[in-house]
């Protein structure tokens, strides 16, 4: 991963397999390095741009060589500082809001529909009243889901109606003959 980083330089001498890279070797040759966190792959750094530029400027100046032990603890110290900074931010940036008290409900159903008790109910025309009134068998309109086969004289069975008409005609004819 660190092969393509711009700020890293590789040492000119290859390290021996048995040699430990201690502070003595760093004293011989200063090497610019950037700390890379393994948790995020080096993509997002928690340091700000100001801190990075300040460290880069101080790294350019000849100073005492840094010890490797600092690098070992740098990752752990960054995470602890980050965690404490988060807890401070959460505690200080969240002001306590007063609990809003609910207003007592004064609305009733009539108020919700803007119905005034003083106003008179709407007058219906007599035609509409007559259509809505149920007169029984003589209901003028056959409307609704249960009004199949309902005529002006109520529910009718055509077969029975035909039989009644035949009997009445026969009765009339029989009476006329007498």
UniProtKB/Swiss-Prot annotation:
The modification N6-acetyllysine is found at residues 64, 150, 152. One of its GO terms (cellular component) is nucleus. Pfam families: PCNP. Residues 139-149 have a biased composition (Polar residues). The keyword Phosphoprotein applies. Residues 37-47 have a biased composition (Low complexity). InterPro entries: PCNP. Its main location: nucleus. Residues 1-84, 134-178 are annotated as: Disordered. Ubiquitinated; mediated by UHRF2 and leading to its subsequent proteasomal degradation. The modification N-acetylalanine is found at residue 2. Residues 1-15, 160-178 have a biased composition (Basic and acidic residues). The modification Phosphothreonine is found at residue 139. The keyword Cytoplasm does not apply. It is found in: Nucleus. One of its GO terms (biological process) is protein ubiquitination. Keywords: Acetylation, Cell cycle, Nucleus, Phosphoprotein, Ubl conjugation. The modification Phosphoserine is found at residues 53, 77, 87, 119, 147. Transmembrane segments: none annotated. Interacts with UHRF2/NIRF. May be involved in cell cycle regulation. This is PEST proteolytic signal-containing nuclear protein. It comes from Bos taurus.
């Amino acid at each position: 991963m660190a092969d393509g980083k711009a700020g890293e330089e590789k040492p000119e001498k290859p390290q021996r397999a048995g040699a430990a890279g201690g502070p003595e070797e760093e004293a011989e040759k200063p090497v610019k390095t950037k700390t890379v966190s393994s948790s995020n792959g080096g993509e997002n750094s928690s340091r700000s741009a100001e801190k990075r530029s300040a460290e880069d400027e101080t790294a350019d100046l000849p100073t005492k060589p840094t010890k490797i032990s600092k690098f070992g603890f740098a990752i752990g110290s960054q995470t602890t500082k980050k965690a404490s900074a988060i807890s401070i931010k959460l505690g200080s940036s969240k002001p306590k809001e007063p609990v809003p008290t609910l207003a007592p409900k004064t609305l009733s159903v009539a108020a919700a529909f803007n119905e005034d008790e003083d106003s008179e109910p709407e007058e219906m025309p007599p035609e509409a009243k007559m259509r809505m009134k149920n007169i029984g068998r003589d209901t003028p309109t056959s409307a609704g889901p249960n009004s199949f086969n309902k005529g002006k004289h109520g529910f009718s069975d055509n077969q029975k109606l035909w039989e009644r008409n035949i009997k009445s005609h026969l009765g009339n004819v029989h009476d006329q003959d007498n």
